[in-house]
């Protein structure tokens, strides 16, 4: 299948589900992105359509604006990259997504036939309507993020652990965590 056919099919299905929810799509560039932005946060995900046939799906990111604004006030990022339309600094990231059989993390899902395209798209939509929606509902509330951070600490894991963590970033994740704790009046 051609890359354009894959994009057309996936975007038409995603648009039907996400546009009524208020998502905006940015379908140009190497990382087509869907964004739901509000006064408090931006929820987004992106995809990559690779020349070798693979399609990747990022799972959900949430940028909690108050956290990122505080962090940005003393730890600036490159404003030319973070445009707050398509690109946001990410506060949290859903690392616990259940991937479809045949999906290779970091590489994607190889789509050569219509049935594979349908299966991949169904998986993305199912995630967005179920586990993804639950992720947004749970972690758009800062005390729930703090609770997960506390659980990770008890388990001896860093907040941005690659397999089960909740916060995005590297060293800046620690700053995000401290900001979240302070906003939740945690000592």
Describe the predicted segments one by one.
Residues 2-7, 35-187:
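Intrinsically disordered, low-complexity regulatory regions enriched in serine/threonine/proline
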Residues 3-27:
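Amphipathic alpha-helical segments
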């Amino acid at each position: 299948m051609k890359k354009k056919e894959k994009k057309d099919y996936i975007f038409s299905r995603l648009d039907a589900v996400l546009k009524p929810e208020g998502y905006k799509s940015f379908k140009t560039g190497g990382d087509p992105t869907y964004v739901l932005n509000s006064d408090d946060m931006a929820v987004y995900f992106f995809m990559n359509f690779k020349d070798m046939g693979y399609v990747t799906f990022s799972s959900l990111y949430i940028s909690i604006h108050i956290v990122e604004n505080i962090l940005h006030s003393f730890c600036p990022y490159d404003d030319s990259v973070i445009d707050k339309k398509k690109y946001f600094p990410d506060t949290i990231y859903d690392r616990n997504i259940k991937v479809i059989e045949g999906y290779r993390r970091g590489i994607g899902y190889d789509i050569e036939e219509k049935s594979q395209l349908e299966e991949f798209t169904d998986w993305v939509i199912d995630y967005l309507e179920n586990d993804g929606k639950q992720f947004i509902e749970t972690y758009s509330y800062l005390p729930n993020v703090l609770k997960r951070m506390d659980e990770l600490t008890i388990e001896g894991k860093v907040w941005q652990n690659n397999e089960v963590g909740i916060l995005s970033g590297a060293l800046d994740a620690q700053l995000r965590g401290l900001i979240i704790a302070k906003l939740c009046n945690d000592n």
